[in-house]
Curated annotation (Swiss-Prot):
The keyword Cell membrane does not apply. One of its GO terms (biological process) is cytoplasmic translation. This is Large ribosomal subunit protein uL6. InterPro entries: Ribosomal_uL6-like, Ribosomal_uL6-like_a/b-dom_sf, Ribosomal_uL6_a/b-dom, Ribosomal_uL6_bac-type, Ribosomal_uL6_CS. This protein binds to the 23S rRNA, and is important in its secondary structure. It is located near the subunit interface in the base of the L7/L12 stalk, and near the tRNA binding site of the peptidyltransferase center. The lineage of its organism: Bacteria, Pseudomonadati, Thermodesulfobacteriota, Desulfuromonadia, Geobacterales. SUPFAM superfamilies: Ribosomal protein L6. Part of the 50S ribosomal subunit. It comes from Geobacter sulfurreducens (strain ATCC 51573 / DSM 12127 / PCA). It holds the Pfam family Ribosomal_L6. GO terms for molecular function: rRNA binding; structural constituent of ribosome.
């Protein structure tokens, strides 16, 4: 039995859970999320908790058991608290600006980068060098942060580029040169 999968998920007050035709819909104060539940896994919903059960002990069902529980828990946390990922921009002249649902980035290229944010994602810019990606879908927040980071990843010599706030960049020594 999956150690993660067998733990029940508590439903906080103000969260509404619906499950029909293998589609789970969770609605809370921050928004609404839906997800298709995998075959071989079923959900038992009570007014205070959700339990993930598997149909048999086959490899596919065992693999999906813990994963499904974690995905459902992330949905519950997302509609109640939300998720965020912080990014930092390092480099002379590197800056970011959020205008509605478009993020404008100047990263040392010959052209600015205008990145259209996915629906449900908000980016807050602080002092033009610190970004916070926020949303209710953990997967989408992570993908958006990774996409923004990919425009100019941190380089190991001077540390210029976009990095996660909690990321440590391994720095390399430059050329020593001939003497």
């Amino acid at each position: 039995m999956s150690r993660i999968g067998k733990r029940p998920i508590e439903i906080p007050s103000g969260v509404k859970v619906e499950f029909s035709d293998s589609v789970l819909t969770i609605e809370g104060p921050k928004g609404k999320l839906s997800r298709q539940v995998m075959d071989g896994v079923s959900l038992e919903i009570t007014p205070s908790s959700i339990e993930v059960k598997r149909a048999d002990d086959g490899l596919k069902a065992r693999s999906a058991h813990g994963l499904t529980r974690t995905l459902v828990n992330n949905m519950v946390v997302g509609v109640t608290k939300g998720f965020e990922r912080a990014l930092e921009i390092n480099g002379v002249g590197y800056r970011a600006e959020a205008k509605g649902d478009v993020l404008n980035l100047s990263l040392g290229y010959s052209h600015p980068i205008n990145y259209a944010l996915p629906a449900g994602i908000i980016v807050e810019v602080d002092k033009m060098t610190k970004l916070v990606v926020k949303g209710i879908d953990k997967e989408l927040v992570g993908q958006t942060a990774a996409k923004i980071r990919s425009f100019r990843g941190p380089e190991p010599y001077k540390g210029k580029g976009i990095k996660y706030a909690d990321e440590k960049i391994l720095r390399k020594a430059g050329k020593t040169g001939k003497k």
